[in-house]
């Protein structure tokens, strides 16, 4: 034992003189494990970088092909040889800039990939091929030396145990072998560990350098791309300026087209209801330089306003509900109302997943943009119920204030969530909700009523559309009922509230407190079972806003033609006084007589007629505006016995035959309405006659000549007789009146049927012309 201790001490001294001692041997485990890990990581990283490099090479080639295609595409928009192909020069130039930029950037990417391959991949490949092998050789030498040391040490231990039975020489020989193995193992271990350490250090330094160079390569790549983008910025600004001019030209063209295309389908469109024509206003007693417009012209003005391009702001999405309704003069935004009516159709309300299935997002976006721009005001040509339901949800979602408002959120939710306060009674809860809904603004309430009515009807078809009240509430509630600060709990409460409102639609909206709120014209239909939404296809009174009928035209006076048969006039009455003769004539076929003393007025006189025995529907003491179109005059014409002057646009009409001769001064103030023309056998203008033109000299009735016609007051009950268009022109040179040639068949009486007997004596119609007007009468060609 004493010798062993001495030998062990000598070995320690020998090992202590070396640079690397046995105390570093525990590092062997750490370093060998590090080398194994580095070998695995290096192999994986090498494969990834190689794959990345190949992928980038393919990307570079594809991007270069893309740049070439863009350059070719730019040539389609401009051709310097043929000016007719210059579709859009700014677009062609921009495509050219983009194509060249992509090509340059891909060249930079090519350089970037080469730098990575040369530095990082080369370093990793070198480590895998040489350094890893050197490390493995050092490890093998270390293991071999350790085995020799372990064998010598074990042999020495065995001899020591048997030292009493063996010679001392064998023990000394074993001790020398152990000393040699220990020295050899110490040298190999020091050398192997040093080699491993050098390999690890080299890998770390080279990897750091490769990673740093990669970052610099990325920096150079992006810097070159940025520099190139900045270099083309000036050219891009020039093309932007040219494109702005191009857009301005497009806007001008669009305005010209829109004035023709907009509201092209006037007869079939249900967008705007035409108002009825305004009643004729009574003329003032004072002279007016501009006459009142005729009813026909007012109709034309209304039609022009209807087909005109909508001006001002037509935006619907993102606008306040009150702003839209005030702008459109409606209770509910028109396009939303039409959408609800569309969804109420049987084929749409039974669509599976209505209000849940999403449509084509591009179609929805295009529809919203066109509605905001005012290009679409109807749903003609749209048959996708999912598109329209999503359109309605998008409108509700983009409202700046939700449909049920922020202020009423907690009030509505509390009615349903705190149902214990109402003993869980649906009727009491519904009444509480009714009290809250009364506080809604008018547009919000009416739209909510129509919307909930639609949802209730959809829920009744849940067996077909798979949309129960719960499903509908989940899809609609987040768009119509939410607080200012959203959270999960508020959404859950809103879903429960909307589900209750849909389920109890009849109890809520048929409540007496709000059933007639705001006098909603599109009330809930459906009778005792509740009803659908406003004006739906299920029943109820049609909303006048959806009327497609144009305003009724003013009634045209009925023309009366005397046929070639004698009038049924009592013979005895013709021999009586002039008043009784006039009365019997009026009761048979002639109009009521004109008063002998009409009110006198220098301009726009008012004539009052009283005819208690007339068969027409003329009210007594009817005031008539003589400035309106002669077709709408309420006074019957009569033959004038003398020349009279008038300030109206029409020629004078004669008095009834039974009337006595009227002084010229009084008749100058009479304003006639209808011209009686085609007179035969003209006589002196100053000659008067008291002979009844409808009777012979013996007092018996006689037929009427072919050249006489007159208007009776229109009773607005009969249909006007078809008329031919006579060739007759009346020109008025008065510059202060709105006269025009009577070329329309509505302005002339129909021709008379031919008769055999001529009229005996009728005076021609003449008129005293003032200095400001001249009226010329051309004969009517009755051929």
From Swiss-Prot:
Residue intervals passing through the bilayer: none
Cellular localization per UniProt: Cytoplasm
The keyword Cytoplasm is annotated on this UniProt entry: yes
Protein name: Rho GTPase-activating protein gacR
Chain segments carrying region Disordered: 262-299, 527-745
Positions with biased composition (Gly residues): 527-539
Rho-GAP domain span: 319-509
Residues flagged as site, Arginine finger: 356
Molecular function via GO: GTPase activator activity
GO terms of biological process kind: small GTPase-mediated signal transduction
PANTHER family listed in its UniProt record: RHO GTPASE-ACTIVATING PROTEIN 68F, RHO GTPASE-ACTIVATING PROTEIN GACR
Sections of the chain in a coiled coil: 138-188
Keyword Cytoplasm appears in the UniProt entry: yes
Example of a GO cellular component annotation carried by this entry: cytoplasm
Biased composition (Polar residues): 706-738
Gene: gacR
Keywords of this entry: Coiled coil, Cytoplasm, GTPase activation
Lineage top rank: taxon: Eukaryota
Function according to Swiss-Prot or TrEMBL: Rho GTPase-activating protein involved in the signal transduction pathway.
Feature: compositional bias, Low complexity: 283-299, 568-589, 599-630, 641-651, 661-698
């Amino acid at each position: 034992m004493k010798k062993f201790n001495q030998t062990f001490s000598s070995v320690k001294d020998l090992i202590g003189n070396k640079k690397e001692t046995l105390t570093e041997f525990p590092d062997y485990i750490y370093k060998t494990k590090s080398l194994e890990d580095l070998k695995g990581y290096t192999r994986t990283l090498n494969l990834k970088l190689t794959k990345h490099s190949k992928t980038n090479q393919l990307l570079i080639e594809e991007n270069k092909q893309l740049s070439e295609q863009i350059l070719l595409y730019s040539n389609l928009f401009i051709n310097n040889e043929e000016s007719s192909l210059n579709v859009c020069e700014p677009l062609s130039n921009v495509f050219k800039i983009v194509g060249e930029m992509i090509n340059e950037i891909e060249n930079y990417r090519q350089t970037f990939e080469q730098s990575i391959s040369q530095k990082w991949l080369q370093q990793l490949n070198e480590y895998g091929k040489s350094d890893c092998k050197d490390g493995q050789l050092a490890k093998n030498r270390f293991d071999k030396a350790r085995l020799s040391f372990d064998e010598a040490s074990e042999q020495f231990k065995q001899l020591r145990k048997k030292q009493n039975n063996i010679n001392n020489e064998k023990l000394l020989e074993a001790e020398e072998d152990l000393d040699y193995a220990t020295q050899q193992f110490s040298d190999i271990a020091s050398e192997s560990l040093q080699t491993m350490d050098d390999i690890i250090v080299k890998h770390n330094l080279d990897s750091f350098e490769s990673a740093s160079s990669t970052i610099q390569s990325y920096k150079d790549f992006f810097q070159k791309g940025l520099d190139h983008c900045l270099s083309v910025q000036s050219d891009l600004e020039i093309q932007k300026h040219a494109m702005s001019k191009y857009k301005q030209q497009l806007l001008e063209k669009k305005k010209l087209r829109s004035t023709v295309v907009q509201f092209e389908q006037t007869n079939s469109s249900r967008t705007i209801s035409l108002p009825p024509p305004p009643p004729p206003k009574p003329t003032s007693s004072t002279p007016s330089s501009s006459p009142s417009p005729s009813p026909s012209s007012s109709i034309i003005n209304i039609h022009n306003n209807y087909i005109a391009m909508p001006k001002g702001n037509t935006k619907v999405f993102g606008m306040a509900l009150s702003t839209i309704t005030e702008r459109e003069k409606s209770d509910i935004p028109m396009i939303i109302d039409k959408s609800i009516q569309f969804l109420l159709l049987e084929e749409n309300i039974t669509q599976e997943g209505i209000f849940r299935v999403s449509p084509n997002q591009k179609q929805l976006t295009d529809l919203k943009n066109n509605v905001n721009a005012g290009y679409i005001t109807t749903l003609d040509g749209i048959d996708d119920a999912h598109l329209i339901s999503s359109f309605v949800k998008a409108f509700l979602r983009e409202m700046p204030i939700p449909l049920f408002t922020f202020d009423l959120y907690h009030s509505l939710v509390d009615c349903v969530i705190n149902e214990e306060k109402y003993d869980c009674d649906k009727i009491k809860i519904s009444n509480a909700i009714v009290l809250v809904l009364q506080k809604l603004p008018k547009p919000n309430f009416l739209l909510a009523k129509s919307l909930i009515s639609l949802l209730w009807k959809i829920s009744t078809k849940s067996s077909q559309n798979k949309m129960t009240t719960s499903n509908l509430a989940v899809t609609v509630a987040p768009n119509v009922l939410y607080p200012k600060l959203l959270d999960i709990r508020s959404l859950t409460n809103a879903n429960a509230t909307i589900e209750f409102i849909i389920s109890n639609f009849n109890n809520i909206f048929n409540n007496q407190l709000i059933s007639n709120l705001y006098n909603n014209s599109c009330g809930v239909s459906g009778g005792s079972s509740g009803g659908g939404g406003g004006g739906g296809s299920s029943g109820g009174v049609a909303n006048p806003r959806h009327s497609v009928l144009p305003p009724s035209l003013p009634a045209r006076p009925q023309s009366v033609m005397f046929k070639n048969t004698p009038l049924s006039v009592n013979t005895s009455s013709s021999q009586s006084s002039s008043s009784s003769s006039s009365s019997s004539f009026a009761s048979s076929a002639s109009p009521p007589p004109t008063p002998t003393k009409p009110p006198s007025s220098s301009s726009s006189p008012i004539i009052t007629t009283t005819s208690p025995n007339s068969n027409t529907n003329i009210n007594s003491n009817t005031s008539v505006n003589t400035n309106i179109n002669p077709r709408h005059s309420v006074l019957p014409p009569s033959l004038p016995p003398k020349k009279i002057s008038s300030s109206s646009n029409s020629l004078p009409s004669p008095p009834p035959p039974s009337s006595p001769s009227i002084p010229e001064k009084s008749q100058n103030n009479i304003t006639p309405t209808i011209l009686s023309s085609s007179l035969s056998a003209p006589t002196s203008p100053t000659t008067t006659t008291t002979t009844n033109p409808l009777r012979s000299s013996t007092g018996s009735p006689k037929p009427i000549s072919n050249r006489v016609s007159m208007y009776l007051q229109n009773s607005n009950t009969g249909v006007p007789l078809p008329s031919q268009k006579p060739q007759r022109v009346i020109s008025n040179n008065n510059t202060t009146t709105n006269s025009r040639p009577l070329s329309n068949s509505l302005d002339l009486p129909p021709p008379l049927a031919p008769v055999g007997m001529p009229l005996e004596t009728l005076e021609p119609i003449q008129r005293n012309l003032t200095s400001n007007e001249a009226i010329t009468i051309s004969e009517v060609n009755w051929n």
